[in-house]
Amino acid sequence: MVFIGPPASAKTLFLLGILDMIKDGVYFDGSNTTNRILDVLEEERPKIICIDELDKMPRTFQNQLLNFMESGRVKVDQQKKQYDFEIKGAKIFVTCNEIHRLSKPLQSRFRKLFLPRYTEEKFLDVSEKVLPKLSSSLARYIGVLYGRMGVP
């Protein structure tokens, strides 16, 4: 599944919620993840793979992901290491701001869920729920400050 939407539309919260419910999973931040992804996948062989901001990852990685989704196998030759392993039955959840940055074949492998931009009031409600250890008024205040930065 791919969660698509503007910044601050709770895409990452969905991924983290999935990982919280299903413990056999890994999370990668596509905006600053390195080749360590392949090492982690090879070592852990997770049943759930969550990639935040897949649209910011290089096209070469997106192509490798497509091959993996089609075959369940990772086969990559890099300068320093070769990878050749299987992960059968893994479920993949990703987020992206701009779906057009993914190739059409990769897009076709995902169910798409479009998340709209929050209204300011909804954003404040979410802030109170996401920051439950804080008092409701402090969580709401943080949401207001964040909103003034132009995020919601």
Predicted feature residues:
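Conserved AAA+/SF3 P-loop NTPase catalytic/coupling segment centered on the Walker-B
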Residues: 14-17, 45-72, 99-109
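Conserved AAA+ ATPase core "coupling" helix
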Residues: 88, 102-135
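Short glycine-rich substrate-engagement loop in P-loop NTPases that contacts/grips substrate
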Residues: 22-48
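Walker A/P-loop
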Residues: 1-27
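AAA+/SF3 P-loop NTPase mechanochemical coupling elements
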Residues: 41-45, 76-95
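Conserved nucleotide-binding/hydrolysis micro-motifs of P-loop NTPases
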Residues: 7-9, 32-34, 55-57, 92, ...
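Conserved AAA+ ATPase small/helical "lid" subdomain
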Residues: 135-152
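Conserved RecA-like P-loop NTPase ATPase core
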Residues: 3, 12, 18, 37-38, ...
